[in-house]
Structure formats: structure tokens, C-alpha cells
């Protein structure tokens, strides 16, 4: 399946993300697009943010290239090309001017509606308990939650990008071993393109990070993973339960922390640093140890 030309294509994606991030970092510093130090942050000096714009942009261009080369369908182009473009754009605007939580939530629901509509998800018959439109709302809520949950992962250096690389690599390996990859070519193409894009950004985001992905990266990745879950489950490529296992620690940490905050904190939806991995990073004063520790823990969990 993977030809030399496709390996070259992935190498170009990787190199483009490296070069693009390097250039964007200079741009962000020049125009003061940085995360300053405050009581909510865990970094020790102002750091450029919004780097997710780069690997998101490279991914989107790659999706359009695959579409025009007739390697992926029109629906996949709309969801991962057009939809992810809006996801990254919303995130980047939030990185620059800070969108209110309510407005962000509306945009995220629109993104969820887009995915479910384009993929023409037929939710009738999944259960007799809810009708079609109720299932549509439940599915939309779950997609919005995943987008936000992935945003919560981006709390220390290298955490969100390493999570993406680990999750995608696991899925690629799973498809290769369990499923006939020839029957999942489009899914594999998207996963590998996303993987190459993320690896290109990792170099700059690994502790100590010289640039943050920001909401432009975390919302983009959350949207992509949500869309991948919908596409792979309705087409019987990857089961929903496999996705739950693969997300493991990352989803459980964000979900449990949010539920606890809903119970004990009045403004639970506000920015915070209460996740378990953030508490460890604050106590140990070392992002690298925590990020590596979570990776090792997650690998053991997957085994």
C-alpha cells in the first residue's frame, strides 16, 4: 500500500511542518503572539502560541492534494479539508483575541453538525430509546466534548502533540494488524498524513517547548479525532470501544477532572490547571518527566 512516492509525500509534509513552524515562531515573536506568564500557566517565560496553525494548514493542503489526486472521497475532503480548516481558524482566532466560551461552544456544535451531516449518520435503529434527532444531539454533544477534552490535554509541554502521535500510531498499527489495510486505504491515508504533520511539530513543542500549539492546534486535533471516530465507526473500520481504549488516560483525566470541577467549583468551565498531569508538573517542576511518564503509562495501558 505504501509506495516510495507516498513516503516522499509524507516526508514533504514533515519537512513543511518543521520549516513552517520555524518561520511562524519568528512571526509570533515579532507580533507578540505569545502566552504570557500568569497564575494559570505552568511555563516560566513568555512563549509563542498558535503553532497549531502550521501543522493544521499543512494537513489541510495535503487533504486537498489527496482529493484532487482522487485518493479520498468528496465527503472526506469536506470533513477533513473544509471542516478542519474552520476548526483551526476558530482556534487561531481564540489564540489571538480570546473568544468567549459561549461563542466557542456554538462554533464547536456547528462543527459537530457538519461532520454528522456530511457523513449522513443514520442514527435511527441504534436503539429504541431515542429518536433520530435526539441521537443527533447526543452524538453532537459527544463530539463537542471530545474537542474540548483534547483542548484540556494541551496543558504542559509536549502533552497534546505526543498524545496525538501515540493515538494515531496505535490506530495505524491496529488497522495494519487486525484489518486488511487495503479495505481502509482512505482512513490510513488520512491517519498517516496527520501523523506526519504532528511529528513535524513535535520537535518544537517537546519540553522545554519553544512554541505552543494553542487552541488552533488542540481544537483542530480534537475535531479531526472526532471526525475520524464517526467515519471509522459508521463504516466498521474501527469500533467505538477501540477508540475509548486508545484514548485511555487522556480522556479519563480530562473527563474525571471536569466532573469534579462541576461538583465543587462554581465557574467550572473557566481556564485552570487542575488536571492530574498538571499537578504533577507543578510539583515536580519538570514537564519532560510528566510527559514521558504519561507516554509510558499509556503504552503499558495499550499492552
Regions found by a protein language model. Give the residues of each.
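"…together with the soluble PPM/PP2C metallo-phosphatase catalytic core" -> "…together
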Residues: 2-252
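Hydrophobic membrane-spanning alpha-helices of multi-pass integral membrane proteins
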Residues: 193-197, 286-303
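Cytosolic, membrane-interface loops and tails of multi-pass inner-membrane proteins
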Residues: 22-48, 256-288
Amino acid at each position: 500500500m505504501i509506495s516510495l512516492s507516498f513516503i516522499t509525500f509524507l516526508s514533504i509534509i514533515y519537512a513543511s511542518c518543521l520549516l513552517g513552524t520555524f518561520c511562524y515562531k519568528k512571526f509570533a515573536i515579532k507580533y507578540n503572539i505569545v502566552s504570557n506568564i500568569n497564575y494559570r500557566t505552568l511555563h516560566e517565560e513568555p512563549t509563542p502560541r498558535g503553532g497549531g496553525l502550521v501543522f493544521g494548514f499543512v494537513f489541510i493542503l495535503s487533504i486537498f492534494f489527496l482529493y484532487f489526486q482522487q485518493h479520498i472521497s468528496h465527503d472526506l475532503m469536506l470533513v477533513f479539508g473544509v471542516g478542519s480548516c474552520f476548526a483551526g481558524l476558530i482556534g487561531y482566532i481564540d489564540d489571538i483575541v480570546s473568544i468567549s466560551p459561549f461563542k466557542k461552544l456554538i462554533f464547536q456544535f456547528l462543527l459537530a453538525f457538519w461532520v454528522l451531516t456530511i457523513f449522513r449518520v443514520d442514527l435511527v435503529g441504534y436503539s429504541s430509546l431515542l429518536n433520530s434527532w435526539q441521537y443527533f444531539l447526543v452524538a453532537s454533544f459527544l463530539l463537542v466534548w471530545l474537542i474540548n477534552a483534547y483542548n484540556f490535554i494541551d496543558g504542559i509541554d509536549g502533552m497534546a502533540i505526543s498524545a496525538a502521535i501515540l493515538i494515531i500510531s496505535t490506530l495505524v498499527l491496529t488497522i495494519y494488524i487486525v484489518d486488511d489495510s487495503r479495505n481502509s486505504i482512505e482512513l490510513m491515508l488520512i491517519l498517516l498524513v496527520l501523523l506526519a504533520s504532528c511529528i513535524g511539530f513535535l520537535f518544537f513543542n517537546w519540553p522545554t517547548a519553544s512554541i505552543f500549539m494553542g487552541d488552533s492546534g488542540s481544537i483542530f486535533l480534537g475535531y479531526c479525532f472526532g471526525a475520524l471516530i464517526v467515519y471509522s465507526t459508521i463504516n466498521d473500520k474501527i469500533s467505538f470501544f477501540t477508540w475509548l481504549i486508545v484514548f485511555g488516560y487522556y480522556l479519563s483525566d480530562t473527563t474525571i477532572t471536569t466532573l469534579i470541577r462541576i461538583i465543587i467549583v462554581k465557574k467550572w468551565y473557566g481556564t485552570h490547571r487542575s488536571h492530574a498531569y498538571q499537578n504533577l508538573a507543578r510539583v515536580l517542576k519538570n514537564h519532560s518527566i510528566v510527559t514521558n511518564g504519561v507516554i509510558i503509562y499509556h503504552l503499558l495501558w495499550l499492552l
